[in-house]
Structures are given as structure tokens and as C-alpha cells.
Amino acid sequence: MLTFSFLTLFPELLTPFAQEAIVGKARERGLIDVRLVNLRDYAQNKHLKVDDTPYGGGAGMVIRVDVAARALDAACQAGPRPDEVILFTPAGERFTQQVAEELANKQHLVFLCGRYEGFDARVEGLVTRELSLGDFVMMGGEAAAACVLEAVARLRPGVLGDEASHQQDSFSSGLLDYPEYTRPPEWEGHSVPDVLRGGNHAAVARWRRDQALERTLRRRPDLLPGAGLTPQDSAALLALGVTPEQLSIWDAPPPPAPKVRRKKKPSAEDKAPTDTSSE
């Protein structure tokens, strides 16, 4: 079982994500555990104050390192030894699908969710990793924590109904996901592609791969060099207008050689001269 421990000033913000939908069902089935640790419980002062003004002056308040350390100690004692203690910060490593897959193999993850002007810099000595969702700033780490919880929990065995479903998602295959369709087959002049309704599984698989390639080429071409392209993929990309030089830059394999139809050898009857004389 994978345990998520979140150290936060606002546990109520994370409660719905921990109790509802697939994550909530996974908790009920004992596949994961989510623990919310309120930093104010470790303030050790009358007014439960966890922050203070920054040394050197400046706007905002900074969360005290001693408060964070006590909360972290409590989280460590309440569960198995953490594999990772992670701080959410705009200065951290970019969170990606690959990071999610790595974290999904752990047993206990502890996350520090900041607020205000963040944590005292000495908190960095308590963590093993710093993560960021992207190049933007939010009001706190709880929203980032909810994203990471969903991304990691769904990768644990048994959490999703279809074990293979997450392997077909965007980024898991190295490409963006292909478009999906369901009923009705016709809607306001838009039809479901015929190949998806024809029952040819090989053709469907090829169509989906080609659609994923086209979508990735158009929206996220930076993903293609690491997508594990096949010779058939190279042929599809060439058909989409990619040049052979670009394929070479991406280290893509050459497309399959065109099949040459062998001429049928003439039979003895074919070789026999035709008698065109009249009797």
C-alpha cells in the first residue's frame, strides 16, 4: 500500500480529493492511504501561529522551520519510513508522468504544502526532493498536492478498473493520447471515423497510433524524440510532412522499405507459342 502524507495549513482543501471518486474508493479498498497533517497542531503557542516576518524585511510571512520539522517528525512516526519528503515550490523539478510513475513505486510519500511566502529556507534540509507543476505561482501547495495525488494514485495496481488504461494515456506512451469517440455515431454533421466501427482491431490500433502521432506533431513536437518511434511511425510522420532530415534529428528509424511485387513466372503453357494458323 502507498501512503500519502500531506503537511498543510488547510487540510480541508485536500479532504474532498482524498474521500471522493476513484481516490476515495481506493482508500476504502486499502489500496492507498491518505493522511492530512495540520501544521497548526505543531505550533506550540497559544494562538497556533506557524509563521513569522522574514529576516531582512519584505512583504508576507514565512512558515517556521521548527513547526515544519515537528509536523514532519509526527508524520514519520505515524507511518512507515518515508521514501521521499517532497516540497512543492516553483523552483523545484518539473512534475511529469515519468516522475509520477517513479513515485507510484514507493511506499510512503510525505508532501510539504506551503502558503504565504513559503517555508523558511532551512526546510530544504528536511526534504529529499522539490517539485513544481510548472512555471507559475499559486497561493499554496494544496492544489499541486491534489494533482500529484491523482496522478500517482491512479498508477497503483488495482486503483483503476482497467489495468491497461493508464498505459494508453498521454505521455505514458511518449505521445499525446489519440481522440476517443462514443455514441451517437452522428452528431450535428460530425461522424465517428469508419475505421473505429469496422471491427478490424489491427486497423484500429494503427489509426490510433497515427492519430497520436499527428496530434503530438501538431501540439507537442518536443515529445517525439523520446517517444520510441517505430519504422511504421516514421512512415506515418513522413506522410504528415515531416522531412527525412527531421526524422534523423529525432533518431527515428527509417521507414519500412516498399514492398516490391515479384512478377509471376510464366508457366509452360504461357511459354508455348500460340497457333494462329487456320485449318
From Swiss-Prot:
Primary enzyme class: transferase
Residues annotated as binding S-adenosyl-L-methionine: G114, L133, G134, D135, F136, V137, M138
Chief location category: cytoplasm
Biological process terms in GO annotation: tRNA N1-guanine methylation
SUPFAM superfamilies according to UniProt: alpha/beta knot
One GO term describing the cellular component: cytosol
Region listing for Disordered, in residue ranges: 245-279
Catalytic activity: guanosine(37) in tRNA + S-adenosyl-L-methionine = N(1)-methylguanosine(37) in tRNA + S-adenosyl-L-homocysteine + H(+)
Pfam family, one: tRNA_m1G_MT
Protein localization: Cytoplasm
Any one Gene Ontology molecular-function term assigned to this protein's record: tRNA (guanine(37)-N1)-methyltransferase activity
Enzyme nomenclature, EC number: 2.1.1.228
Superkingdom of source: Bacteria
Keywords assigned: Cytoplasm, Methyltransferase, S-adenosyl-L-methionine, Transferase, tRNA processing
Family from the record: Belongs to the RNA methyltransferase TrmD family.
Subunit structure as annotated in this protein's UniProt entry: Homodimer.
Function: Specifically methylates guanosine-37 in various tRNAs.
Protein name: tRNA (guanine-N(1)-)-methyltransferase
Organism: Deinococcus radiodurans (strain ATCC 13939 / DSM 20539 / JCM 16871 / CCUG 27074 / LMG 4051 / NBRC 15346 / NCIMB 9279 / VKM B-1422 / R1)
Species lineage: Bacteria, Thermotogati, Deinococcota, Deinococci, Deinococcales
